[in-house]
Amino acid sequence: MGISYSVEADPDTTAKAMLRERQMSFKHSKAIAREIKGKTAGEAVDYLEAVIEGDQPVPFKQHNSGVGHKSKVDGWDAGRYPEKASKAFLDLLENAVGNADHQGFDGEAMTIKHVAAHKVGEQQGRKPRAMGRASAWNSPQVDVELILEEPEVED
């Protein structure tokens, strides 16, 4: 049994990649996925590198209570710079572009047809407290799937 994606993809025109059980914020993953969908792989890589450097914020359209306003967010007010999740998405994009190149496509020019983050659980952890107690200190785990599609050629 192979890995299943949440959408069907034509293997003749698409390339796929997936992150499994990566320890990062699900909320950050959702915000990044919403922002890079529809961009080319090259544009998405440039965007994520700018997020990591702190030049371009990711708009937080959900779960944005207490999130500060950023002037560089286009069409929205609240935003942050989720560095850890952005690095994971860069790894995913690098993998997807490599898969596309291996299949004979131009990976950098392909558009992101589908990207979705799925919360899959938590890795259990404990944090020692006073008086010999311990509190749960769990890390969320996220699966991310990405499908690149060849751009349509206009006649």
Curated annotation (Swiss-Prot):
Any GO CC annotation of this UniProt entry: cytosolic large ribosomal subunit
GO BP terms in the entry: cytoplasmic translation
Record-linked InterPro entries: Ribosomal_uL22, Ribosomal_uL22_CS, Ribosomal_uL22_euk/arc, Ribosomal_uL22_sf
NCBIfam families, per database record: PRK04223.1, uL22_arch_euk
Family note: Belongs to the universal ribosomal protein uL22 family.
Job of this protein: This protein binds specifically to 23S rRNA. It makes multiple contacts with different domains of the 23S rRNA in the assembled 50S subunit and ribosome.
Name this protein carries in UniProt: Large ribosomal subunit protein uL22
